[in-house]
Amino acid sequence: MVKYDAIILGSGVLGLSIASELILKGLKVAVVGKDLPEDLDSTGFASPWAGASWRSVAVNEAERRRDHYTFEQFARLAKEVPHLCEKRAYYYFWTCEDAWKEPWYKDLVFGYRMLKPEEVHAPFKYGVTYEAYTLNTPLYLLHLASTLRSAHVPIIRARLSSLDEAYSLPQLGPVDLVINATGLGARSLLGVEDPTVFPAKGQTVLVRAPVKECYGLVDPLPQPSQKAYIIPRPGPDGHVILGGCYLPNDWSTNVDPQVAEEILKQCHTLCPRLDGKGGKGTWKDIEVIAHNTGLRPVREAGLRCELEERVIGGKVRAGLATKGGKVGSGRKVSVVHAYGIGPAGYQASLGIAKELGELVDACVKKSSDNKAKL
């Protein structure tokens, strides 16, 4: 049996990106998930349902660093696989003069500038444009998985109830290092059980339209949970994602028809050409392909990206849960947590993978040093 250096729990964009980073470091890894990259219709994980565009919402230096690195890697990806990642024009419109706050990334993206009055259509008064990247998320997930499998990385379907199980899976053998990229699963996975993890429901409409640019509404909508944005997917199909909403602590994956109608109306106002009639039709003329919902994996304090040392096996005092795994005596192991990214999974994914790789380097070095002392 192959001896693996690490097991990655979770096969969403973070888990697959982390696996890709670790094999570049020469580690033998395997990916384990309840849902697999091919499960593109599953609401069990958020990754297949994203837009996804690169528009950073970073609020601190660590988040900016991750987003910046991912942006640079998307530039490479756009050259290598343009049907997955493509540089597009972005346009944002608003009516209240002070609504737009100059973003930290204005010198990172391409051609950032305020729009001239004649470039802004009614009912809006102001606008900004720049160029950044968009992804075809379902195809990107499949691309990551295919690349990993070509590198002999197994991606296995398994449902685990506890973190401890991952260190001794029958299909993979014992490991001393697990990467926890379980997303919402971190709330219920025994040994993690993070009560600050919660879902934020999103709803979008997949349409076919002759639109190549991204659009966003800056002004708040009557419902604070609702946003208006347009994200064309790279590729020849003419697919465009219209959104959306952000509903914290909503576990429902049902489509709300009223939300869907509001999305279509607001997005048609943003870009009338969505109607396929050169802007002369109405929102009802938009060619709808599918209505989608997904649950974003949010954590109150933001992303958890840290190394934790644990002890598994041995005797555990009666009545105590496995959370933390530090009670009793047994085998010393490590876990690196990478969950709680919320709506920023794609635009931060490669930066998070790089940061996590550095944590794994430190963990492996410490383990080697300890063995050398024995």
From Swiss-Prot:
<feature type="binding site">
    <location>
        <position position="35"/>
    </location>
    <ligand>
        <name>FAD</name>
    </ligand>
</feature>
<feature type="binding site">
    <location>
        <position position="296"/>
    </location>
    <ligand>
        <name>FAD</name>
    </ligand>
</feature>
<feature type="glycosylation site" description="N-linked (GlcNAc...) asparagine">
    <location>
        <position position="180"/>
    </location>
</feature>
<feature type="binding site">
    <location>
        <position position="246"/>
    </location>
    <ligand>
        <name>(R)-lactate</name>
    </ligand>
</feature>
<keyword id="KW-0285">Flavoprotein</keyword>
<keyword id="KW-0560">Oxidoreductase</keyword>
<dbReference type="GO" id="GO:0005782">
    <property type="term" value="C:peroxisomal matrix"/>
</dbReference>
<dbReference type="InterPro" id="IPR023209">
    <property type="entry name" value="DAO"/>
</dbReference>
<feature type="binding site">
    <location>
        <position position="11"/>
    </location>
    <ligand>
        <name>FAD</name>
    </ligand>
</feature>
<feature type="binding site">
    <location>
        <position position="296"/>
    </location>
    <ligand>
        <name>(R)-lactate</name>
    </ligand>
</feature>
<feature type="binding site">
    <location>
        <position position="34"/>
    </location>
    <ligand>
        <name>FAD</name>
    </ligand>
</feature>
<feature type="binding site">
    <location>
        <position position="342"/>
    </location>
    <ligand>
        <name>FAD</name>
    </ligand>
</feature>
<feature type="short sequence motif" description="Microbody targeting signal">
    <location>
        <begin position="372"/>
        <end position="374"/>
    </location>
</feature>
<keyword id="KW-0325">Glycoprotein</keyword>
<feature type="binding site">
    <location>
        <position position="46"/>
    </location>
    <ligand>
        <name>FAD</name>
    </ligand>
</feature>
<feature type="signal peptide">
    <location>
        <begin position="1"/>
        <end position="19"/>
    </location>
</feature>
<dbReference type="GO" id="GO:0019478">
    <property type="term" value="P:D-amino acid catabolic process"/>
</dbReference>
<feature type="binding site">
    <location>
        <position position="347"/>
    </location>
    <ligand>
        <name>FAD</name>
    </ligand>
</feature>
<dbReference type="GO" id="GO:0098754">
    <property type="term" value="P:detoxification"/>
</dbReference>
<feature type="binding site">
    <location>
        <position position="229"/>
    </location>
    <ligand>
        <name>(R)-lactate</name>
    </ligand>
</feature>
<feature type="binding site">
    <location>
        <position position="229"/>
    </location>
    <ligand>
        <name>anthranilate 1</name>
    </ligand>
</feature>
<feature type="binding site">
    <location>
        <position position="246"/>
    </location>
    <ligand>
        <name>anthranilate 2</name>
    </ligand>
</feature>
<dbReference type="InterPro" id="IPR006076">
    <property type="entry name" value="FAD-dep_OxRdtase"/>
</dbReference>
<comment type="function">
    <text>Catalyzes the oxidative deamination of D-amino acids with broad substrate specificity. Enables the organism to utilize D-amino acids as a source of nutrients. Enables the organism to utilize D-asparate and D-glutamate as a nitrogen source and may also contribute to utlization of D-tryptophan, D-tyrosine and D-asparagine as a nitrogen source. Protects the organism from the toxicity of D-amino acids, including from D-glutamate. May play a role in its interaction with the host.</text>
</comment>
<keyword id="KW-0274">FAD</keyword>
<comment type="similarity">
    <text>Belongs to the DAMOX/DASOX family.</text>
</comment>
<dbReference type="GO" id="GO:0071949">
    <property type="term" value="F:FAD binding"/>
</dbReference>
<feature type="binding site">
    <location>
        <position position="51"/>
    </location>
    <ligand>
        <name>FAD</name>
    </ligand>
</feature>
<keyword id="KW-1015">Disulfide bond</keyword>
<feature type="binding site">
    <location>
        <position position="47"/>
    </location>
    <ligand>
        <name>FAD</name>
    </ligand>
</feature>
<protein>
    <recommendedName>
        <fullName>D-amino-acid oxidase 3</fullName>
        <ecNumber>1.4.3.3</ecNumber>
    </recommendedName>
</protein>
<feature type="binding site">
    <location>
        <position position="346"/>
    </location>
    <ligand>
        <name>FAD</name>
    </ligand>
</feature>
<feature type="disulfide bond">
    <location>
        <begin position="214"/>
        <end position="271"/>
    </location>
</feature>
<feature type="binding site">
    <location>
        <position position="296"/>
    </location>
    <ligand>
        <name>anthranilate 1</name>
    </ligand>
</feature>
<dbReference type="GO" id="GO:0003884">
    <property type="term" value="F:D-amino-acid oxidase activity"/>
</dbReference>
<feature type="binding site">
    <location>
        <position position="14"/>
    </location>
    <ligand>
        <name>FAD</name>
    </ligand>
</feature>
<keyword id="KW-0576">Peroxisome</keyword>
<feature type="binding site">
    <location>
        <position position="345"/>
    </location>
    <ligand>
        <name>FAD</name>
    </ligand>
</feature>
<dbReference type="Pfam" id="PF01266">
    <property type="entry name" value="DAO"/>
</dbReference>
<keyword id="KW-0732">Signal</keyword>
